[in-house]
Amino acid sequence: MDIIKTTGQMQQWSERVRKQGKTICLVPTMGYFHDGHLSLMDAGRTQADHLVVSLFVNPIQFGANEDLDAYPTDHDRDFKLAELKGAAVVFAPGPEELYPPGFQTAVTLSQLPLHLCGLSRPVHFQGVATVVTKLFNIVGPDVAVFGSKDFQQLQVIRRLVKDLNFNIRIMGCPIVREADGLAMSSRNLYLSADERNSALSLSCSLALAAEMVQAGETRCRPIIAAVEKFILGHQGTQVDYVCLCDPLTLEAVDTITSPVLLALAVQVGTTRLIDNQVIDPEQ
C-alpha cells in the first residue's frame, strides 16, 4: 500500500492506473477508523480494481467553537487498518496541501444545506462540498463510497455530482451500529459511560417513531413530540433537531404518506451526535 501526501503524486498515481485500464474507488474519511469506516472499505473494494482511502480532517467544514482541535487522530493505526482492508493507496494530505496560501474558492449548494444540520452548522456543507470536489478532481475515482449516518451529506454529494457533471457513481452504505444500537462515530470516543448510556436514546427513539407509524400514526407533530420527550428524558441531552422530511429534498413534511426520513441531532454532554432512519408507512 502506498501512502501519498501530495496532490501531484496522487494525480500521477491515478493517471497511471487509468492508462492501465483500471478503475478506482474512493472512500473519503476524516480518519480514526471504526467498523463503519471499515465497512465502507469492504464495500468499495468490490466496486473497482483499486481502492483509495483519503484521510483528511477538513478544517473548513468545522465552524467556530466546534471540535476541530479535539477531533481524534491516529494515522499509524489508520494506515495499518486500511492496508488490511486492501487499500492500494491512503491519500493523507495536510491542510496546507489542499488549502495553500491564497486559496479562495468554495463550492456551495443553494437548497439542501438549508435543512437539518445546515441550520446550526452554517459553514459545514460548503466545507464538505469544497473538499469532496477537490478529492474527486485529485483522485479521479469511478466510484465513491459514503456512509448514510450523515444522510444529508450523502444527498449533498449526490446533488453535487449531478449538478457539476462528475462522471462518478456515488454508493451509499447502511449505518453500522454497536451491538446496543448506537451508531458508530469517531466522536463516540468523547462520551463518558453515563453519556454513552444517554446516547442510546437516539437509536431507541428511531424505533419508537417507527412503531408509532406502524401503529397508524401519520401526523408528524405527535411523532416528533414523542421522540423529543423520550430523548430529553435521558440525562445530559439537548435536542438540536428532530425532523421528519422528504428523503430527497430534506424538506419537512406534516403528514406521512410515503417513505420519510427521520433525522436527529442531539447534544449529549458536550458531544453532538446524529442518527437517522427511513420509515415506510407501508411496512
UniProtKB/Swiss-Prot annotation:
Pathway: Cofactor biosynthesis; (R)-pantothenate biosynthesis; (R)-pantothenate from (R)-pantoate and beta-alanine: step 1/1. The keyword NAD does not apply. CDD domains: PanC (cd00560). Keywords: ATP-binding, Cytoplasm, Ligase, Nucleotide-binding, Pantothenate biosynthesis. (R)-pantoate binds at residues 61, 153. It is found in: Cytoplasm. One of its GO terms (molecular function) is pantoate-beta-alanine ligase activity. ATP binds at residues 30-37, 147-150, 176, 184-187. One of its GO terms (cellular component) is cytosol. It catalyses: (R)-pantoate + beta-alanine + ATP = (R)-pantothenate + AMP + diphosphate + H(+). It is an enzyme of class 6 (ligase). Pfam families: Pantoate_ligase (PF02569). Beta-alanine binds at residue 61. Its EC number is 6.3.2.1. Homodimer. Belongs to the pantothenate synthetase family. This is Pantothenate synthetase. It comes from Desulforapulum autotrophicum (strain ATCC 43914 / DSM 3382 / VKM B-1955 / HRM2).
